[in-house]
Swiss-Prot record:
Keywords per UniProt: Acetylation, Chlorophyll, Chloroplast, Chromophore, Manganese, Membrane, Metal-binding, Phosphoprotein, Photosynthesis, Photosystem II, Plastid, Thylakoid, Transmembrane, Transmembrane helix
Subcellular location as annotated: Plastid, Chloroplast thylakoid membrane
Oligomer and partners: PSII is composed of 1 copy each of membrane proteins PsbA, PsbB, PsbC, PsbD, PsbE, PsbF, PsbH, PsbI, PsbJ, PsbK, PsbL, PsbM, PsbT, PsbX, PsbY, PsbZ, Psb30/Ycf12, at least 3 peripheral proteins of the oxygen-evolving complex and a large number of cofactors. It forms dimeric complexes.
Comment on bound cofactor: Binds multiple chlorophylls and provides some of the ligands for the Ca-4Mn-5O cluster of the oxygen-evolving complex. It may also provide a ligand for a Cl- that is required for oxygen evolution. PSII binds additional chlorophylls, carotenoids and specific lipids.
Positions of the pro-segment in this chain: 1-14
Residues the record lists as Phosphothreonine modifications: 15
Entry function: One of the components of the core complex of photosystem II (PSII). It binds chlorophyll and helps catalyze the primary light-induced photochemical processes of PSII. PSII is a light-driven water:plastoquinone oxidoreductase, using light energy to abstract electrons from H(2)O, generating O(2) and a proton gradient subsequently used for ATP formation.
GO biological-process terms attached to the record: photosynthetic electron transport in photosystem II
A molecular-function term among this protein's GO annotations: electron transporter, transferring electrons within the cyclic electron transport pathway of photosynthesis activity
Protein name: Photosystem II CP43 reaction center protein
Keyword Thylakoid: yes
Gene: psbC
UniProt source species: Sorghum bicolor
Bilayer topology term: Multi-pass membrane protein
C-alpha cells in the first residue's frame, strides 16, 4: 500500500480512502488526507489554504448581498419588519439607515445600496478565492515570506493574531464613527417612541463599562445583556476597539512568553479549535442578546421580547379595564394578589397576574409610567399616551413564540398574529450554531492535543470492508 504521509512533515492522522484518487494534484498520498477531509489537505499549502479562505469569505458576503436584495424586493413598508420574516433589514435599520421617528421606514434605497455593495465585494473575493485555489502559488513562504507561515512558528502565529485583533478593533470603531459622525444610529429610547440620533455623550467610565462584565447573568442583573442605553453601547465599542487595537499591536511586537509557549498546543488544528471555541461563545452571547435586549435589537424592527409581549398584554388590559371603571390600584385577582398591580418582593409596584415573573422588563413604552417605587398609580391614571397604548397592543399580539409551522402568538390569545418573530429565528439559530461550534471545538481540541502528545493514529481499519471493495474510479 502507498505511504500515507507527506514527506514535508509527518501528520499523525490516518484517513484511509481510495489512495489513487487525485484531486487537483492534492491527493491522499501527498497529504495524508482524503478528498472528503476538505481543507485538511491544504494544511501545509499556505497558498491554496488562502484561496479556500478567500473563497469562503466570498460565499459569506454573497449570501449577505443576495439575501439583502431578496429582503428589499419582498419588503412591504406598511407592515412592521418583524412581521415579514426579515433578519438583515432590521440590522440596517438599527444602524439608522432609511428610518425615521418610531422606526418608520422612509427610504429603502440605502438597503438596496448595501445589497449591491456586498454583491460586488463578493465577486472580488470570489475571483481572489478561485485565483489562489487554482492559479496562485501552492505555498507563499518562498515568494511572499510576509504572508507565509509555519504552524508551529509561535512568533509568526501571534503576529497573525495581532493583525486580526487590529482588524476587529477597527470594525468596532466603524460603529462608533457611524453613531458619532455619520448620521447616528436608531435609539429606541428617544422621547415619543424612538428615533435616529447622533450619540454625543459617550459613556467612557471604566467602572460603568466593565461593571457590566461583573454583574450576575441572572434576572434583574443580566450581565452585559442588560445594557439599555446607547451611550453605554457605543462607549463600550470605544473601549473594545481600543483594547483590540492595542492588544493587536502588542501581539505583533512581542513573542509569546514561556508560560504561553508551554500552555498552548501550537498546530493548525489547535488554532482551529481555539477559533471554534471563541465563535461558540459569540453564538451563545448573541442568542441571549437578541432574545432579551430591546436596545441593541429594537422591538420596532425585531418585534417585542418575550417578557415585553407579556407585560404589554397586562398593560393593554389595565388600560381597557381602567376606562371601563375598574380601580386598577385595588382590584383583586383570582389568587388574592392584585389583578392589575401588585408589589414585587423588594417593594416595587409591578404588573399583577402571570406577567409578574417579568417584572424587571424595561421598555421605552413603559418606563415613562414608572416612579421611584415602580409603576406610578397617578401616572397610570393620567399620563398614558396614545402611542404607548398602540405599541403595547401591537406587541401583545406579536409575542415571539412561533413554532416551526408558524402557530404564532400565545395559545390562549385569539388576536395573536400568525408569524415567527425574527427574535425566535435569530436566538434559536445562534444557540444551535453555538452548540455545534462548541462540539467542533471539543473535537478538534482533542485531536490537536492527541497529535501533540504523539498518540493520534486514527481508527484501526485493518478489517474495514471498504478496503476490499473496488475503487470508485
Amino acid at each position: 500500500m502507498k505511504i500515507l504521509y507527506s514527506l514535508r512533515r509527518f501528520y499523525h492522522v490516518e484517513t484511509l480512502f481510495n489512495g489513487t484518487f487525485v484531486l487537483a494534484g492534492r491527493d491522499q498520498e501527498t497529504t495524508g488526507f482524503a478528498w472528503w477531509a476538505g481543507n485538511a489537505r491544504l494544511i501545509n499549502l499556505s497558498g491554496k489554504l488562502l484561496g479556500a479562505h478567500v473563497a469562503h469569505a466570498g460565499l459569506i458576503v454573497f449570501w449577505a448581498g443576495a439575501m439583502n436584495l431578496f429582503e428589499v424586493a419582498h419588503f412591504v413598508p406598511e407592515k412592521p419588519m418583524y412581521e415579514q420574516g426579515l433578519i438583515l433589514l432590521p440590522h440596517l435599520a438599527t444602524l439608522g439607515w432609511g428610518v425615521g421617528p418610531g422606526g418608520e421606514v422612509l427610504d429603502t434605497f440605502p438597503y438596496f445600496v448595501s445589497g449591491v455593495l456586498h454583491l460586488i465585494s463578493s465577486a472580488v473575493l470570489g475571483f481572489g478565492g478561485i485565483y489562489h485555489a487554482l492559479l496562485g502559488p501552492e505555498t507563499l513562504e518562498e515568494s511572499f515570506p510576509f504572508f507565509g507561515y509555519v504552524w508551529k512558528d509561535r512568533n509568526k502565529m501571534t503576529t497573525i493574531l495581532g493583525i486580526h485583533l487590529i482588524l476587529l478593533g477597527l470594525g468596532a470603531f466603524l460603529l462608533v464613527l457611524k453613531a458619532l459622525y455619520f448620521g447616528g444610529v436608531y435609539d429606541t429610547w428617544a422621547p415619543g417612541g424612538g428615533d435616529v440620533r447622533k450619540i454625543t455623550n459617550l459613556t467612557l467610565s471604566p467602572g460603568v463599562i466593565f461593571g457590566y462584565l461583573l454583574k450576575s447573568p441572572f434576572g434583574g442583573e443580566g450581565w452585559i445583556v442588560s445594557v439599555d442605553d446607547l451611550e453605554d453601547i457605543i462607549g463600550g465599542h470605544v473601549w473594545l476597539g481600543s483594547i483590540c487595537v492595542l492588544g493587536g499591536i502588542w501581539h505583533i511586537l512581542t513573542k509569546p512568553f514561556a508560560w504561553a509557549r508551554r500552555a498552548f498546543v501550537w498546530s493548525g488544528e489547535a488554532y482551529l479549535s481555539y477559533s471554534l471555541g471563541a465563535l461558540s461563545v459569540f453564538g451563545f452571547i448573541a442568542c441571549c442578546f437578541v432574545w432579551f435586549n430591546n436596545t441593541a435589537y429594537p422591538s420596532e424592527f425585531y418585534g417585542p421580547t418575550g417578557p415585553e409581549a407579556s407585560q404589554a398584554q397586562a398593560f393593554t388590559f389595565l388600560v381597557r379595564d381602567q376606562r371601563l371603571g375598574a380601580n386598577v390600584g385595588s382590584a383583586q385577582g383570582p389568587t388574592g394578589l392584585g389583578k392589575y398591580l401588585m408589589r414585587s418582593p423588594t417593594g416595587e409596584v409591578i404588573f399583577g397576574g402571570e406577567t409578574m415573573r417579568f417584572w424587571d422588563l424595561r421598555a421605552p413604552w413603559l418606563e415613562p409610567l414608572r416612579g421611584p417605587n415602580g409603576l406610578d398609580l397617578s401616572r397610570l391614571k393620567k399620563d398614558i399616551q396614545p402611542w404607548q397604548e398602540r405599541r403595547s397592543a401591537e406587541y401583545m399580539t406579536h409575542a415571539p413564540l412561533g413554532s416551526l409551522n408558524s402557530v404564532g402568538g400565545v395559545a390562549t390569545e385569539i388576536n395573536a398574529v400568525n408569524y415567527v418573530s425574527p427574535r425566535s429565528w435569530l436566538a434559536t439559530s445562534h444557540f444551535v450554531l453555538g452548540f455545534f461550534f462548541f462540539v467542533g471545538h471539543l473535537w478538534h481540541a482533542g485531536r490537536a492535543r492527541a497529535a501533540a502528545a504523539g498518540f493520534e493514529k486514527g481508527i484501526d481499519r485493518d478489517l474495514e470492508p471498504v478496503l476490499y471493495m473496488t475503487p470508485l474510479n
